[in-house]
C-alpha cells in the first residue's frame, strides 16, 4: 500500500510558549508539503488563517485544550469564536473527569453544545485514551457516533500517553467506516504513522509532519 502521508497530517503546534513566528513557520511548512491542515490554539487561528488564505491547507483549532474541564458554555463559545476567526475544523477535549464520575449525560451534552455551535464545521472529539478504559473509549465513541460528529481523536499529547495502535483499532471498530479517526500524540516517524493508518486512522495529528513525509526521525520531545 502506497500512502500519501501528507494527506493525513494535521501539522500541529500547541505549545503554550509557541510564538507567532513559529506559527508562521508551521504554516509555511504545511504549504510546502501540502499537509491536510495545521492545528493551533484558538488564539493563533487569525494568524494561521491569514497565512493559509488561498491554499488548500485547512486551519484546525483546539477547544478546551488540553484539560477539557472548563465550562461547557465556554467551550461552545470558543468553538464559535474560532470558526468566526477562520477555523475550518474544531478539535475539542471531552471532560474526562465527568466521564470517570459517571456523569454520562453531562459529557454528551458538553459535546453536543460544541457540535451545535460548529454547525457545518467538522468537529473532532479528543478522548484522551491514555486515561480511559477500553469500555470508556467505546462509550465515548458510541456517544460521538450518535451525535454525528466528524471524528474521534485519541489524545491531546499533553497527558500521560499518546496514540496507541490498539486504541485506534478499537475506536475504528466502534465508530465504523463512516466516521474519521484521528491518531495524535507520539506519532513522530513514518513507521508509527503507517501503523496508525493501517489500524484505522484517517488523520494524524503531529508536530513531526516534515520528518514523516521525508522519512526521518523527529526528536522525542515532538508532539
UniProtKB/Swiss-Prot annotation:
<dbReference type="InterPro" id="IPR028581">
    <property type="entry name" value="DeoC_typeI"/>
</dbReference>
<dbReference type="InterPro" id="IPR011343">
    <property type="entry name" value="DeoC"/>
</dbReference>
<dbReference type="GO" id="GO:0009264">
    <property type="term" value="P:deoxyribonucleotide catabolic process"/>
</dbReference>
<dbReference type="InterPro" id="IPR002915">
    <property type="entry name" value="DeoC/FbaB/LacD_aldolase"/>
</dbReference>
<comment type="function">
    <text>Catalyzes a reversible aldol reaction between acetaldehyde and D-glyceraldehyde 3-phosphate to generate 2-deoxy-D-ribose 5-phosphate.</text>
</comment>
<comment type="similarity">
    <text>Belongs to the DeoC/FbaB aldolase family. DeoC type 1 subfamily.</text>
</comment>
<dbReference type="GO" id="GO:0016052">
    <property type="term" value="P:carbohydrate catabolic process"/>
</dbReference>
<keyword id="KW-0456">Lyase</keyword>
<dbReference type="InterPro" id="IPR013785">
    <property type="entry name" value="Aldolase_TIM"/>
</dbReference>
<feature type="active site" description="Schiff-base intermediate with acetaldehyde">
    <location>
        <position position="153"/>
    </location>
</feature>
<dbReference type="GO" id="GO:0005737">
    <property type="term" value="C:cytoplasm"/>
</dbReference>
<feature type="active site" description="Proton donor/acceptor">
    <location>
        <position position="182"/>
    </location>
</feature>
<protein>
    <recommendedName>
        <fullName>Deoxyribose-phosphate aldolase</fullName>
        <ecNumber>4.1.2.4</ecNumber>
    </recommendedName>
</protein>
<dbReference type="GO" id="GO:0004139">
    <property type="term" value="F:deoxyribose-phosphate aldolase activity"/>
</dbReference>
<keyword id="KW-0963">Cytoplasm</keyword>
<keyword id="KW-0704">Schiff base</keyword>
<dbReference type="GO" id="GO:0006018">
    <property type="term" value="P:2-deoxyribose 1-phosphate catabolic process"/>
</dbReference>
<comment type="pathway">
    <text>Carbohydrate degradation; 2-deoxy-D-ribose 1-phosphate degradation; D-glyceraldehyde 3-phosphate and acetaldehyde from 2-deoxy-alpha-D-ribose 1-phosphate: step 2/2.</text>
</comment>
<dbReference type="Pfam" id="PF01791">
    <property type="entry name" value="DeoC"/>
</dbReference>
<feature type="active site" description="Proton donor/acceptor">
    <location>
        <position position="91"/>
    </location>
</feature>
